[in-house]
C-alpha cells in the first residue's frame, strides 16, 4: 500500500507512510504520508473508504461515508491546530501542519452520475482532494498528475 499511496505526494528521495497513527487517542487517519524536500518535511493525510460506496447519493448529496470521511479530516486538522506542539514534540511529527493536503479515496468512477460530475469535482477544495479508486489507480499506474 505505501508504494501505491506514494503517488499522492510529489516525488522525493525520502518518503514515509505511517499506518493508523493516533491523534489525541480517538482521531486516527488511515495513513499519514511524509516526504522531505528542500522545504523540509511535508505531510498529507489519507482516508480510505470502500470502493463499493458511492461518494454521492442519487440526489447529488454527499453519501454518509464521504460526509464522515470529510468530518474526520476536519477533526484531525482541528486537533492539530490545538495541539501542534504536542504532535511535533511527542509524536515526532516534524513540521506537521494542520493545513497539510488530505485525500479521501472512495467509490468508483461508475458511481458518479453525469448530472453530478460538476458537484463531484467541486468536492476537491481547501486542500482536500476527493477521488475514486479508479482515479487513484490512474495516478499510480500512469503517473497522471493530481488535479488541484
Question: What is the predicted function of each stretch?
Answer:
Residues 1-148:
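Charged, terminal alpha-helix-loop-beta segments
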Amino acid at each position: 500500500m505505501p508504494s501505491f499511496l506514494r503517488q499522492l505526494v510529489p516525488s522525493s528521495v525520502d518518503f514515509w507512510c505511517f499506518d493508523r497513527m493516533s491523534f489525541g487517542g480517538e482521531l486516527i487517519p488511515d495513513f499519514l504520508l511524509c516526504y522531505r524536500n528542500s522545504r523540509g518535511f511535508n505531510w498529507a493525510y489519507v482516508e480510505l473508504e470502500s470502493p463499493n460506496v458511492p461518494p454521492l447519493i442519487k440526489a447529488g448529496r454527499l453519501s454518509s461515508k464521504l460526509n464522515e470521511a470529510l468530518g474526520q479530516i476536519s477533526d484531525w486538522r482541528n486537533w492539530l491546530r490545538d495541539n501542534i506542539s504536542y504532535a511535533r514534540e511527542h509524536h515526532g511529527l516534524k513540521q506537521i501542519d494542520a493545513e497539510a493536503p488530505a485525500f479521501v479515496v472512495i467509490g468508483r468512477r461508475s458511481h458518479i452520475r453525469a448530472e453530478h460530475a460538476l458537484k463531484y469535482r467541486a468536492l476537491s477544495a481547501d486542500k482536500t482532494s476527493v477521488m475514486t479508486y479508479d482515479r487513484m489507480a490512474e495516478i499510480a499506474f500512469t503517473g497522471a498528475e493530481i488535479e488541484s
